[in-house]
């Protein structure tokens, strides 16, 4: 199992798009897809362990899990890179740099572009700690961002970034 460090995020992918579900449907969003999931949708634990050991699947490969093939499940997870616990441990600065490189930074800081934490399962304990530490880091290193939204900064509302967590709803948040 990959150990998540408190100063890094295990990121499977990150990208800019438009939110396609929930109350923020249609809102420009930056998705941070984290590795690891606590479910084995459509697969037995034995099958999942075999896949993790052999690493026989390519990222994005669509297949049917053993339980789906046996008629014991109606579907199989479509996010292989997430439930196989894949991802790259990224320093917190990685996301800030990506947002700046893509010209999205000011709109993320001001909340015009939402940040969506998804996965995998972002509410797994290690991810909870890493996400909170990311925001602490962001605030500590990027005082200059306050000048982007001076009115909010003067009132103590920085960052004004809007963040959402997409979850499978099976993890209790402490």
Regions found by a protein language model. Name each.
Residues 12-25, 33-38:
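N-terminal beta1-alpha1 ligand-phosphate binding loop
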Residues 2-4, 9-13, 39, 43-174:
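Conserved Radical SAM active-site core
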């Amino acid at each position: 199992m990959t150990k998540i460090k408190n100063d890094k995020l295990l990121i499977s992918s990150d990208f800019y798009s438009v939110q396609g579900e929930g109350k923020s449907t249609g809102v420009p969003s930056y998705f941070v897809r984290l590795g690891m999931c606590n479910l084995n949708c459509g697969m037995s634990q034995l099958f999942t362990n075999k896949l993790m050991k052999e690493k026989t699947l390519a990222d994005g490969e669509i297949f049917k899990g053993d339980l789906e093939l046996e008629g014991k499940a109606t579907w199989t997870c479509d996010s292989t890179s997430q439930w196989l616990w894949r991802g790259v441990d990224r320093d917190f600065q990685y996301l800030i740099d990506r947002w700046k490189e893509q010209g999205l930074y000011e709109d993320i800081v001001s909340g015009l572009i939402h940040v969506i934490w998804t996965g995998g399962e972002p509410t797994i304990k290690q991810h909870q700690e890493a996400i909170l530490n990311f925001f602490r880091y962001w605030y500590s290193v990027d005082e200059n961002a306050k000048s982007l939204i001076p009115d909010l900064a003067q009132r103590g509302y920085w960052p004004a970034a809007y963040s959402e967590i997409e979850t499978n709803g099976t993890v209790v948040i402490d």
